[in-house]
Each structure stands twice: as structure tokens, then as C-alpha cells.
Swiss-Prot record:
GO terms for biological process: 2-deoxyribose 1-phosphate catabolic process; carbohydrate catabolic process; deoxyribonucleotide catabolic process. CDD domains: DeoC. It comes from the Bacteria. Pathway: Carbohydrate degradation; 2-deoxy-D-ribose 1-phosphate degradation; D-glyceraldehyde 3-phosphate and acetaldehyde from 2-deoxy-alpha-D-ribose 1-phosphate: step 2/2. It comes from Mycolicibacterium paratuberculosis (strain ATCC BAA-968 / K-10) (Mycobacterium paratuberculosis). This is Deoxyribose-phosphate aldolase. Catalyzes a reversible aldol reaction between acetaldehyde and D-glyceraldehyde 3-phosphate to generate 2-deoxy-D-ribose 5-phosphate. The gene is deoC. Keywords: Cytoplasm, Lyase, Schiff base. One of its GO terms (molecular function) is deoxyribose-phosphate aldolase activity. InterPro entries: Aldolase_TIM, DeoC, DeoC/FbaB/LacD_aldolase, DeoC_typeI.
Amino acid sequence: MTPTRAQLAAFVDHTLLKPEATAADVAALVTEAAELGVYAVCVSPTMVPAAVQAGAGVRVASVAGFPSGKHVSAVKAHEAALAVASGAAEIDMVIDVGAALAGDLDGVRADIAAVRDAVGGAVLKVIVESSALLALADEHTLVRVCRAAEDAGADFVKTSTGFHPTGGASVRAVALMAEAVGGRLGVKASGGIRTAADALAMLDAGATRLGLSGTRAVLDGLG
């Protein structure tokens, strides 16, 4: 059954992570988020105060180690903790994709665990850059990384930053990730979801959250 506009909106993190975003842009994002009835907004750590100050009762998410993941774990953890202290209720952190490709799952787990410990009860989503893992390794690697995220205390696994040259979310990746975590964790599809058809395909594949920057266009596409 096709969801209603309100039902689809409830899956969405309305996202603005462009480096040129201003506090005014974030305030407009929050206003639009409240109008559209989305689950949350997702903004850069420096923009969390602006999102909180914009009010409207909208849940705020932020990012850590974004977008490369090539940050010392202690830096990711501190960045995430600062975002939570500023009012973020959720953190989307980026793994070290190179470590994952090298088979260093202990390092991947330790990196995630450091952020998990730093954010307390905040929701932790782990961005695995699924397109890179599939393009540069294989399905087994993606599954193993998702299970490592679960072992380290993640609440969600997330496909993509949307900034990696190998691409964003795919139905194939979402299905593999959903199977890997077996309903024990959420699955967030993000990156390149531009139409209602894209969004519905991700939900059908097992996504439980969607990261969208063009949320209004996606919702309007439901007809």
C-alpha cells in the first residue's frame, strides 16, 4: 500500500549539509520541516544551535566525522558530544571506509564505540558508504560492516553521506543492510533519493528512515 503524504514524511530526516549553508538557511529548513511534518532535520554540527533556536518543536540530528570519516575517533566522539550538548537528539557518524575495506573490523567497531560512549542516549546512526563498499569490495564486506556497527552499539546503519564519488543509496544496498541487521537496528537510506518512486523503493527494500534534501519534491510526487 502506498503511504499517504503524512506517513511518508514521518520517515524523513530533512537534510541540509552543504558547506555553504547559513543560519538563515537552517532556520528556513526547520520552518519547512515543521510544515511538512517530517521526523527530523539533519544539519552540520555548527548549525545545531541555529536549528534548535528556530524552534517549531522539530527534532534535530547532526553528523560526526562527515563526510570522509578520516578523523581520529576521539575527534569524532568529541564532535558528536558537542552536537548533543547543543541540542542534537541524533548523530549520523561516518566510518573509516578505508579501514573497512582493509578488513580492520576491530578498528571500525572501536571507532563506532567511541562515538556511542560519547553521545549517551542519543540515537546513533552509522554511515557505512554502502556504494563504496559494494564498488570497491563486495556484498559480504557491507554485511560484515553492518554487523560490526550493531556490535558497537549503533541504533541505525545508514547507506551514504551523499558526498562519495561512488554514489548514494541503492535498493540493493538497503536490502542487504536490512537483512544484515534483521530488524534489530534501523536502516537509513540517504543520498540520491530525489523522487517519490525512489523513496518508496527504499522503503520497500527495508529502509526505516530516509535522508532527503528535496523533501517537498518527493512528497509532492506522491500525487
